[in-house]
């Protein structure tokens, strides 16, 4: 089986490349300069291209990555399946406190450029009228080897290592997490074998900031403080019944990986 990964140098894409290769399948990972020049069948496309950490300062790159390249690939290339990697952030939009730009269709919720671009990408997939196009909304991903400090868990472990954690969200905040091993398996099978066009991807592991911080304090003897006026974000459990039924998916429980991950990332 042949796969093509766009965004193969990113956190998810790079891991996915190694995983699929280890399964014995062919993986084509075009360089950015070749994104718009492919004229062959790309097999099973997994679209991991995206901007996450500094998107507020990279508006043009964000739209280019989440929408413009997607438009080109759906319109101009041939493929056996196409899986657009979106975000579970869209399941939990934040309540708006500002009233500057407040489109009525979005009700009382914030409409930041990240969510807007992902929604545009999803809408394009749905209305492309192309066969076998899927959308996968992925929750917060945990890679026990990721010391980039560019996501919440990696960053907070780096802070613990230095001796002091400064929280930008409350201890009561809870989010959905998935181990990257589980994610890689699901992204490999959804394109070729998925029967639906939309999937929520999670693992029934909801973890609070409090649980993470308490473990890090025990592991590193660090201190922690919360910034003023921090917000509490409580995500509800993501419905993953479709991926459990279709792919015999049995998610790895946090009891297996959470503490080991915190130990490794805080070294």
What kind of region is each of these model predictions?
Residues 1-23:
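N-terminal Rossmann NAD(P)H-binding glycine-rich loop of SDR-like oxidoreductase domains
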Residues 6, 45-49, 82-88, 136-138:
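SDR active-site strand-loop-helix element
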Residues 35-76, 89-90:
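NAD(P)H-binding glycine-rich loop region in Rossmannoid oxidoreductase-like domains
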Residues 71-113:
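Conserved Rossmann-fold NAD(P)-dependent oxidoreductase catalytic core, especially the SDR/UDP-sugar
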Residues 113, 117-120:
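Active-site helix of classical SDR
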Residues 123-175, 180:
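NAD(P)-dependent short-chain dehydrogenase/reductase
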Residues 168-267:
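C-terminal substrate-binding subdomain of Rossmann-fold SDR/epimerase-dehydratase oxidoreductases
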């Amino acid at each position: 089986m042949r796969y093509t990964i766009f965004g193969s140098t990113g956190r998810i894409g790079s891991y996915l490349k190694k995983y699929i290769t280890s399964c014995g399948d062919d993986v084509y990972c075009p360089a950015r300069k070749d994104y718009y020049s492919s004229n062959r069948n790309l097999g099973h496309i997994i679209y991991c291209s995206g901007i996450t950490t500094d998107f507020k300062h990279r508006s043009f790159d964000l739209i280019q990555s989440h929408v413009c390249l997607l438009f080109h690939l759906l319109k101009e290339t041939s493929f056996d399946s196409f899986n657009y990697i979106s975000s579970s952030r869209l399941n939990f939009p934040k309540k708006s406190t500002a009233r500057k730009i407040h489109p009525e269709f979005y009700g009382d919720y914030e409409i930041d450029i990240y969510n807007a671009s992902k929604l545009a990408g999803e809408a394009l997939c749905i209305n492309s009228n192309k066969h076998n196009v899927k959308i996968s909304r992925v929750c917060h991903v945990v890679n026990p080897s990721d010391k980039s400090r560019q996501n919440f868990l990696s960053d907070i472990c780096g802070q613990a290592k230095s001796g002091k954690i400064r929280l930008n969200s409350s201890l009561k905040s809870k989010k959905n997490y998935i181990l990257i091993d589980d994610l890689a398996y699901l992204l490999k099978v959804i394109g070729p074998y998925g029967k639906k066009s939309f999937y929520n991807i999670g693992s029934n592991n909801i973890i609070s900031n409090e649980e993470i911080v308490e473990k890090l304090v025990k592991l590193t003897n660090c201190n922690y403080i919360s910034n003023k006026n921090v917000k509490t974000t409580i995500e509800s459990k993501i419905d993953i019944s479709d991926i459990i039924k279709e792919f015999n998916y049995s998610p790895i429980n946090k009891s297996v990986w959470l503490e080991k991950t915190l130990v490794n990332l805080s070294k």
